[in-house]
């Protein structure tokens, strides 16, 4: 499954949505907030700005020093919430010690929550009525649809229970009438569970503790590998890619699978947020 190709198709649709919004007087704008000087976080933010430029989304780049307090950050978020020219707010994680992530995320306006992580948007997702959905889960669903993977009545196993991936995916798959099982670090004998799955989504990210091997996958299953592990071999996912590819009908590579979809969905969510704000201004 080629995440780059699917992401390119999504970006073309986003370009059209941006052009339509601009023709109606709305210039979609994403504001990013980076606290501290973590090099990896800086790279991620630059990549997001570059992706926005590709599709015509305007950006604001807010950089705060490592001595920034939680109060300073909350004040900036309040300003961005009230700024009518800003449609999406993204606070790059992780945050420095002493700043509570839940406090920061909860401060973002749900209408501008392009990460889909505010308590309100998380609750709407459980009810099946969310408009802004976490980018990685949304990208996974987009990729499955692109490849015409039928989900209704299928058995899905998630090997992750985080609020970024596993929990949102659980609700998204339930909404598509799949039967969903969630595995995690305390699950005993994950292979006995994953072997019955039609779709496996794995996002552990620690090859020393977990590798998805062919004996854990049934013939013809779809394998979505969200994980990224760095080693002297380069970037790898959870799956033993070459071996599992022999059994899977579809599998995502690492890199080049889910990663590009996450960025593409950020762009999509930004245009969705701009449309929401525009509709409320009528």
Curated annotation (Swiss-Prot):
GO MF terms held by the record: methenyltetrahydrofolate cyclohydrolase activity; methylenetetrahydrofolate dehydrogenase (NADP+) activity
Coiled coil: none
PROSITE patterns to which the protein is assigned, alphabetical: THF_DHG_CYH_1, THF_DHG_CYH_2
GO cellular component, one term: cytosol
Highest taxon in the source lineage: Archaea
One of the protein's GO biological processes: methionine biosynthetic process
InterPro entries referenced in this protein's UniProt entry, alphabetically: Aminoacid_DH-like_N_sf, NAD(P)-bd_dom_sf, THF_DH/CycHdrlase, THF_DH/CycHdrlase_cat_dom, THF_DH/CycHdrlase_CS, THF_DH/CycHdrlase_NAD-bd_dom
Enzyme Commission code: 1.5.1.5, 3.5.4.9
Pathway(s) where this gene product acts: One-carbon metabolism; tetrahydrofolate interconversion
Keywords tagged on the record: Amino-acid biosynthesis, Histidine biosynthesis, Hydrolase, Methionine biosynthesis, Multifunctional enzyme, NADP, One-carbon metabolism, Oxidoreductase, Purine biosynthesis
Binding site for NADP(+): 160-162, 185, 228
Pfam families: THF_DHG_CYH, THF_DHG_CYH_C
Chemical reaction(s) catalysed: (6R)-5,10-methylene-5,6,7,8-tetrahydrofolate + NADP(+) = (6R)-5,10-methenyltetrahydrofolate + NADPH; (6R)-5,10-methenyltetrahydrofolate + H2O = (6R)-10-formyltetrahydrofolate + H(+)
Entry keyword annotation includes Oxidoreductase: yes
Membership in a protein family: Belongs to the tetrahydrofolate dehydrogenase/cyclohydrolase family.
Subunit structure: Homodimer.
Role this protein plays: Catalyzes the oxidation of 5,10-methylenetetrahydrofolate to 5,10-methenyltetrahydrofolate and then the hydrolysis of 5,10-methenyltetrahydrofolate to 10-formyltetrahydrofolate.
Name recorded for this polypeptide: Bifunctional protein FolD
């Amino acid at each position: 499954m080629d995440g780059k190709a699917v992401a390119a198709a999504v970006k073309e649709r986003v370009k059209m949505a941006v052009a339509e919004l601009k023709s109606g007087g709305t210039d979609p704008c994403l504001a990013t907030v980076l606290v501290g000087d973590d090099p990896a976080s800086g790279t991620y933010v630059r990549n997001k700005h570059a992706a926005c430029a590709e599709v015509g989304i305007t950006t604001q780049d807010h950089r705060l020093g490592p001595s920034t307090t939680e109060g300073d950050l909350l004040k900036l978020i309040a300003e961005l919430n009230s700024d009518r020219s800003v449609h999406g707010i993204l606070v790059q994680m992780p945050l420095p010690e002493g700043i509570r992530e839940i406090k920061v995320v909860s401060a973002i306006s749900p209408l501008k929550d392009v990460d889909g992580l505010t308590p309100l948007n998380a609750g709407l997702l459980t009810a099946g009525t969310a408009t802004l959905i976490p980018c990685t889960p949304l990208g996974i669903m987009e990729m499955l649809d692109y490849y015409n993977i039928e989900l209704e009545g299928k058995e899905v196993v998630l090997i992750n229970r985080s609020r970024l991936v596993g929990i949102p995916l659980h609700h998204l798959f339930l909404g598509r009438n799949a039967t969903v099982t969630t595995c995690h670090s305390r699950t005993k004998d994950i292979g006995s569970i994953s072997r019955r799955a039609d779709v496996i989504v794995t996002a552990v990210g620690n090859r020393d503790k977990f590798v998805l091997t062919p004996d854990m996958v049934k013939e013809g299953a779809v394998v979505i590998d969200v994980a990224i592990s760095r080693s002297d071999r380069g970037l790898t996912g959870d799956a033993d890619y070459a071996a599992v590819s022999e059994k899977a009908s579809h599998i995502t590579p690492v890199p080049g699978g889910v990663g590009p979809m996450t960025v593409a969905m950020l762009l999509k969510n930004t245009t969705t947020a701009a449309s929401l704000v525009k509709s409320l201004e009528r």
